[in-house]
C-alpha cells in the first residue's frame, strides 16, 4: 500500500470503489435538437421585432441603498414580462399549474447596461427565440422610457415540467401558440 521514493518520502496508493468515481458527463445536446419556430429568424437578429411589450414603473421599495433598482429586482421584471407574454398568447401560467404542470427557469443570464431609479418608466420586451423538445428559449430587453435607453439584456431557458417536476415535452398546443405569435408579428 505504501511505496518509498528516492527521497525517502512515502507515497500511498488508494483505490476507491467504482461507485465513488464520477460518471462521464455528456455534453448538453439541446443545441443539436434545437429547432427554431416557424417564421422566426435566429441568425444574429438585432431588430426588435416580434416582441411582446409591457410598460412598468419603478417603485420605491425596489431600490437599494444607492437609490437605484436592486439587481435582484430585474429578474422579477423579467418574470413579469414572461408571464404577461404567455398570458397574451393564451397560456395561463396558473392554469398550467392547476393542471399539474410547471414551467421552470433553470438558466437566466442578465447583462446590466444602465440603472433605473425611483419613478422611472420602462418597457419590458419579451420574445421566444427558439424551442426544443422540452425547452423554450427567450430573450428579454428593458428600455427606459421615453427615450428607449437600453437598461438590460437577458437570455434564458424555460423547461416544461410534469406533475413530478421532471422535464417533459412542450405540449403541441403551446408550440402552436408561440408559432402563431411569431408569424403574426413578422407580418405586422
UniProtKB/Swiss-Prot annotation:
Single GO term (MF): fatty acyl-[ACP] hydrolase activity
One annotated GO biological process: lipid metabolic process
Transit peptide: 1-47
Catalytic residues (positions): 64
The protein, known as: Acyl-acyl carrier protein thioesterase ATL2, chloroplastic
Domain of life of the native organism: Eukaryota
Gene Ontology terms: cellular component: chloroplast; nucleus
One Pfam match: 4HBT_2
Classification via PANTHER family: 4-HYDROXYBENZOYL-COA THIOESTERASE FAMILY MEMBER, NOVEL THIOESTERASE SUPERFAMILY DOMAIN AND SAPOSIN A-TYPE DOMAIN CONTAINING PROTEIN (0610012H03RIK)
Keyword ATP-binding: no
Residue ranges the record marks as coiled coil: none
Keywords noted in UniProt: Chloroplast, Hydrolase, Lipid metabolism, Plastid, Transit peptide
Locations listed in the record: Plastid, Chloroplast
Tissues with expression: Expressed in endodermal and peridermal cells in young and mature roots, in boundaries of stem lateral organs and developing seeds.
Keyword RNA-binding attributed: no
